[in-house]
């Protein structure tokens, strides 16, 4: 079991007190639309989806049904979790949206997608991915540096 998974289990264990002002009710997960070369990436994504669902924490993600995005969403759904996906219109047209999620929000642009995810999430997790994942992660990190939010990353 990886360090990320162990830390998440600790965070979402019953009776854990968070060193934050508010309880985490939703987590935005930034990750790849591909699974990557290392099978541990998909395993970590599945573990994360399962942990969030069992803790009653809503998964906020990029709405894709492929790659690590699909893995984390499928795992959360399989364990009774609530899953909200945000996707820009042009990606819906490519038929990339996950058909089984709890809620699908369609945005006009990628920037609106990131803003919607940030607005809805109480915390952020980044898993392996490509340039898009890096863009999402660094934008959230920059917003925190600029004091636009104080949510855990």
Task: Walk through the language-model features, giving the residues of each.
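A cross-family phosphate/adenosyl-ligand binding-site feature
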Residues: 20-121, 147
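Leucine-biased recognition of intrinsically disordered, low-complexity hydrophobic segments
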Residues: 3-4, 8
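Conserved phosphate- and dinucleotide-binding cores of soluble alpha/beta proteins
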Residues: 107-111, 116-119, 123-153
């Amino acid at each position: 079991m990886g360090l990320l998974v162990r830390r998440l289990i600790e965070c979402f264990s019953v009776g854990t007190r968070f060193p934050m002002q508010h309880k985490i009710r939703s987590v935005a997960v930034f990750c790849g639309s591909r699974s990557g070369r290392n099978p541990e990436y998909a395993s970590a994504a599945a573990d994360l989806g399962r942990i969030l669902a069992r803790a009653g924490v809503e998964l906020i993600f990029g709405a894709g049904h492929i790659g690590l995005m699909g893995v984390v969403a499928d795992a959360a759904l399989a364990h009774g979790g609530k899953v909200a996906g945000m996707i820009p219109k042009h990606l819906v047209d490519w038929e990339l949206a996950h058909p089984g999620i709890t809620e699908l929000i369609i945005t006009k642009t990628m920037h609106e997608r990131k803003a919607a995810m940030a607005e809805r999430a109480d915390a952020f997790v980044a898993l392996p991915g490509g340039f898009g994942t890096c863009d999402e992660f660094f934008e959230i990190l920059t917003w925190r540096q600029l004091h636009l939010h104080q949510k855990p990353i």
